[in-house]
Amino acid sequence: MSFAGLLDFARKDVDLPQNSPNELLKDLHANFINQYEKNKNSYHYIMAEHLRVSGIYWCVNAMDLSKQLERMSTEEIVNYVLGCRNTDGGYGPAPGHDSHLLHTLCAVQTLIIFNSIEKADADTISEYVKGLQQEDGSFCGDLSGEVDTRFTLCSLATCHLLGRLSTLNIDSAVRFLMRCYNTDGGFGTRPGSESHSGQIYCCVGALAIAGRLDEIDRDRTAEWLAFRQCDSGGLNGRPEKLPDVCYSWWVLASLAILGRLNFIDSDAMKKFIYACQDDETGGFADRPGDCADPFHTVFGIAALSLFGDDTLESVDPIFCMTKRCLGDKQVEMYY
């Protein structure tokens, strides 16, 4: 790590380069994603097999948000995703890999984006998800038994998108989520765990799907999220951590679900997001000057969509998909 990097780590923030981009380089990012999809012999592509379906969702969603989905290889991608389906009803990250809730949701989202969800078996998928709900209302991500509030959102989102939400024990799921609600207004991975921006997104998203946002103090949760903004304008995941462009999405989307987007400095936030763009290769990095990747690219673009960038499709804050492709699957939220 450079001396400047050590200083950034010590003060838990970064400086934005003076020559940072001051607008969204949308076409450059679309080229970055398109090349990433086509360059299947690259080291980074090969080493990402363990999360391939999630990576496909990130790339496809970034292109859909950028109004350039037609550049993607629809038939090839849909067939690959369908090839990740297992006999238990779930989807793995790649063909031959075990099923997991994270990849099952990403598979469903990708098929919806390509208007191919009818090729999936909604009943077997929802039964797979139902089988991972525990007696206390929580969900395991797979048969390994790991419990995490991320998996509650994955479960409710998957079944909602398939029109099978009633398959799950929603009351029990909500009770578990509320056991993870901390006095500071945040949520952790499990009861008693530290509050984290990503977990807040998962929990408020799940509560919104369940129609139970009234269970929490929205202002208190929004205030915890607002304090994640650093002097650079970026957002971090929890106190004393560096800002990261992916939290632009987790925090902003949570605030949007809560109806509290005005709790942060949007102009400063946009400057940070713009500064995380690679103006040579395209794509977004976690922080200015780092290497771009599809994960940070989709969430950087999605965050800018939440701010109303009219060059982008409008994004749904719960599902991180375009409102256009969701149609009547969007969740009504009342404030």
From Swiss-Prot:
Gene Ontology biological process: endoplasmic reticulum to Golgi vesicle-mediated transport; PERK-mediated unfolded protein response; protein geranylgeranylation
Chain positions recorded as geranylgeranyl diphosphate binding sites: 196-198, 238-250
Any Pfam family matching the protein: Prenyltrans
Residues given in the record as Zn(2+) binding sites: D244, C246, H296
Cofactor(s) recorded in Swiss-Prot or TrEMBL: Zn(2+)
GO cellular component terms listed in the entry, alphabetical order: Rab-protein geranylgeranyltransferase complex
Molecular functions per Gene Ontology: Rab geranylgeranyltransferase activity; small GTPase binding; zinc ion binding
Extent of the PFTB repeats: 74-115, 122-163, 170-211, 218-259, 266-312
InterPro entries, per database record: PGGT1B-like, Prenyltrans, Ptb1, Terpenoid_cyclase/PrenylTrfase
Keyword Cytoplasm among UniProt keywords: no
Cofactor-binding details, from the entry: Binds 1 zinc ion per subunit.
This enzyme's EC code(s): 2.5.1.60
Superkingdom in the source lineage: Eukaryota
SUPFAM superfamilies membership: Terpenoid cyclases/Protein prenyltransferases
Keyword Protein transport: no
Keywords: Metal-binding, Prenyltransferase, Repeat, Transferase, Zinc
Catalytic reaction list: geranylgeranyl diphosphate + L-cysteinyl-[protein] = S-geranylgeranyl-L-cysteinyl-[protein] + diphosphate
Function: Catalyzes the transfer of a geranyl-geranyl moiety from geranyl-geranyl pyrophosphate to both cysteines in Rab proteins with an -XXCC, -XCXC and -CCXX C-terminal.
Family: Belongs to the protein prenyltransferase subunit beta family.
Subunit note: Heterodimer of an alpha and a beta subunit.
Name of this protein: Probable geranylgeranyl transferase type-2 subunit beta
Organism: Caenorhabditis elegans
